[in-house]
Structures are given as C-alpha cells and as structure tokens.
Amino acid sequence: MSDIDRNQFLIDHEPYYRPVSNEVALYEAAYAARMPVMLKGPTGCGKTRFVEYMAWKLGKPLITVACNEDMTAS
C-alpha cells in the first residue's frame, strides 16, 4: 500500500473509547508479538470502536468490512 493510499485509511483524530478492563494492554501485547486477534460479540458491543481506537493509537491504517449472517461467499 503506497503512502497516498495508506493515508486515506489513517484515523486522524482520537476516537472516543473507554476501556472496560485490560483489553488495550492485551491488544498491544498481541500486536507486539505479531499475534492475530479475533473480536467476537453482539452487534453494538463496541468491536468496531475498539479497533478504530487501537488503529489510531498504533498509527495504523484501518479498513473495515461489515460482515453479518446475510453475507454470502460470492
């Protein structure tokens, strides 16, 4: 991904996120160890907001894809 493409997916302001437990430290440890992370939970529980916050905090681009039970493989 070129810098021009990358920059359009950077989060330019700090998203509001209030940690509930130690999820930020756990994510940072997984990121440092290059371990994949899977977030699972019901609609509206904060998964997207959390990854937006972590992308901003780590200075990484973020591309989101909405997936649900109506989505097909084609």
From Swiss-Prot:
GO molecular function, one term: ATP hydrolysis activity
Keywords: ATP-binding, Nucleotide-binding
Residues the entry annotates as binding ATP: 41-48
Top-rank taxon: Bacteria
Translocase among keywords: no
InterPro entries attached to this UniProt entry: ATPase_dyneun-rel_AAA, P-loop_NTPase
Family assignment from sequence similarity: Belongs to the CbbQ/NirQ/NorQ/GpvN family.
Function: May affect the post-translational activation and/or assembly of the oligomeric structure of RuBisCO.
Name under which the protein is recorded: Protein CbbQ
Native source species: Allochromatium vinosum
Gene of this entry: cbbQ
